[in-house]
A protein has these predicted regions:
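Extended, low-polarity transmembrane helix blocks
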Residues: 2-67, 73-76, 80-96, 103-161
Length: 161
């Protein structure tokens, strides 16, 4: 038996006994804050797509998304069929994914879907050279990447991965 097998690890010493629990609680809190922020931001971004002149409706949604698709097609290389299909799914996807994150439903998979959705949005904004929007979405993607690193500390979820 080697001497290293007889030596207790520093984490197992009495002086460090409570530190892993404290660290775990802090990481759980950090993940929860990230999950709630990303979920709320995603949900509200989806709901805002249904707004027009102070009211929310499906008619507003299709008008807004049609205008968005036309604008991106007119300012980029992307065809209207592609931008229109993405735009018509976008608001619903944001609402469903945002709600799933807030509730903690399959959080790891939901975070990946959220990240992919934001990368898709970034692609459209890159195509129309909207650098401020790209930077804004890059921050969101960074937060999602951070949440994916911390997802193993997800203690408050309705349906875990």
């Amino acid at each position: 038996m080697s001497s290293s097998e007889n030596t207790p690890s520093p984490a197992a010493s009495p002086a460090n006994a409570g530190k892993s629990t404290e660290s775990s609680c802090e990481l759980t809190a950090a993940f929860l804050l990230l999950r709630l922020f990303i979920g709320l931001r995603t949900l509200l971004a989806g709901i805002e797509k249904f707004e027009g002149k102070g009211t929310y409706s499906f008619a507003n949604y299709y008008e807004n998304m049609g205008r968005m698709a036309q604008g991106i097609t007119g300012a980029s290389f992307m065809p209207l069929w592609m931008t229109r299909n993405f735009a018509h799914v976008l608001g619903y996807a944001l609402v469903v994914i945002g709600a799933a994150l807030l509730l903690g439903l399959k959080t790891r998979a939901t975070l990946v879907l959220t990240g992919l959705l934001y990368v898709g949005l970034s692609f459209g904004l890159i195509a129309v050279q909207e650098s401020e929007g790209v930077a804004w979405l890059a921050i969101h993607v960074g937060l999602i990447a951070g949440a994916l690193v911390l997802v193993r500390h997800n203690r408050f979820a309705l349906w875990k991965d």
